[in-house]
Amino acid sequence: MNIFNQLKQDIIAASQQLYNNQEIANTATIETPKDSFNGDLSSNIAMIIASKESIAPREVALKFKEVLVTLPYIASIEIAGPGFINFTIKAESWQAAIKDILQHEEKFFEIDIDKNSNINIEYVSANPTGPMHIGHARGAVYGDVLARILQKVGYSVTKEYYVNDAGSQINDLVSTVLLRYKEALGEQITIPIGLYPGEYLIPLGEILSKEYGNKLLTMNDVERFKIIKSLAVEKMLDLNRKDLADLGIKHDIFFSEQSLYDKGEIEKTVKLLESMGLIYEGTLPAPKGKVHEDWKHKVQKLFKSTNYGDSQDRPIEKADGSWSYFASDLAYAKDKIDRGANHLIYVLGADHSGYVKRIEAIVKALGQEKVKVDVKICQLVNFVENGVPVKMSKRLGSFASVQDVNKKVGKDIIRFMMLTRQNDKPLDFDLVKVKEQSRENPIFYVQYAHVRTKSILSKARELMPEAYNSFKEGKYNLSLLSTEEEIEIIKLLAAWTKTLEASVKYFEPHRIAFYLINLASKFHSMWNFGKENSDYRFIIENNQELTLARLALASVIQKVIASGLEVIGVEPMVTM
């Protein structure tokens, strides 16, 4: 049985029995206490009921204890702190969890949660101005793994890349390619500061020179701009797609910002918001740091962003009368909603943390409070090689590209390491350490655990074929898995789907990497105990019954590690 789910259902039933209220129990949590002294599982149900019924939490907890302590899988119940109910589960119930995983593998890896959402998740959305640098890899991996997890548990998910092909950086890209075109024609050039000096744009100049000769030089500015922009954006997007594909990332949609202008979508969105009374003409206060007397108050069209929790209303026009970036963000969000999305997730870099409130305001307004929105920020990656920081700047022409790092360490290492810290915390990525074969290298440690579990099963088939066949037929006595180390591993295995569920609930894929590292650590510890004491070995040739039970344990460890690696897009290794 799934102990977490069973306890939750029993708490809901007890809530109905004691307080005629099972709905409130659905909000209660079932967690694994950080300190094993507090039992195996803990719930906050008493505090939730107490708040609703205006009763002391400990009084509520004691009533729940009277009902729940009679359950056959409960060994004991203790009340802690302000009213936490701590449960100790009987060993045989944990052992039964292993049998449940082996006999109902597909069902075990399913999660029963509300899936009535059509989710659009936008991530990466890097300006198509050059090869993708490693700084974008974190958001790319985070967004991709989050999408994979959501899809795994049954959500409808659209993975989207917003192509910023209408901004000033595209103008700079076109200017740089024009210079490379002139260079291809034999002209001596100098790339001014502010443009893109990297050699990756040289081939674009050569393509243009072969196709047009010197015709572009005499062409009018508007026509020439369109030709160069079309080629440059296409080639840079091809480059970015390949960089992402090499990381195992594939978006469903690449959405052009320019298309919003070309199709008049911004005008349509503004008219809609005007009809809703959300656009007005007004002035904004002086920005922080500006002397009030020096600030020129300009009447402009503003969106009532403060109606939805933003710190100030947002201009939808620039000083020259053209649409602001915010205006295109409005139209883009409307397009997503019009396509049927009822939950928008934006994955942004640390440099866009100031956009959170305004994006939330956009979606709340256009979705009329019926569309969910989550904005997740990925903090910076401190990327070093041999202790020396690597500069990451397209404009300087020197940066660690995704392609370069991929060639050095491979996509699996990049994907795993980008999940070794919570997304909103800075991450250190050391190229040397990620290639070490030591316990200090988390990806190696997890993969090595998977390899070892596979080797246990292979060795058993070779040394004890009769026992191995009995294991495959399900002839094992799991009550023999009774050591403290074995029970601790089983508890962790039983918590796998709970970990996956939490990753979905809180949009925190790093929980999976943390879980795998923890599981690998406990497995390796037991393996090492076997080196010191033969009674702890997984294969004991003179004890077939215990070997059968431990083969079952090794098999489940292997399946869970493989499932965890696969859901984050990392291929489980079979040999090293």
From Swiss-Prot:
Key word Plastid present: no
UniProt xrefs under InterPro entries: aa-tRNA-synth_I_CS, Arg-tRNA-ligase, Arg-tRNA-synth_N, Arg-tRNA-synth_N_sf, ArgRS_core, DALR_anticod-bd, Rossmann-like_a/b/a_fold, tRNAsynth_Ia_anticodon-bd
One function term, GO molecular function aspect: ATP binding
UniProt-annotated location(s): Cytoplasm
Subunit architecture: Monomer.
Organism of provenance: Rickettsia typhi (strain ATCC VR-144 / Wilmington)
Renumbered ranges of motif 'HIGH' region: 126-136
Gene Ontology CC terms, in alphabetical order: cytoplasm
The name this protein goes by in its record: Arginine--tRNA ligase
Protein encoded by which gene: argS
Catalyzed chemical reaction(s): tRNA(Arg) + L-arginine + ATP = L-arginyl-tRNA(Arg) + AMP + diphosphate
Top enzyme class: ligase
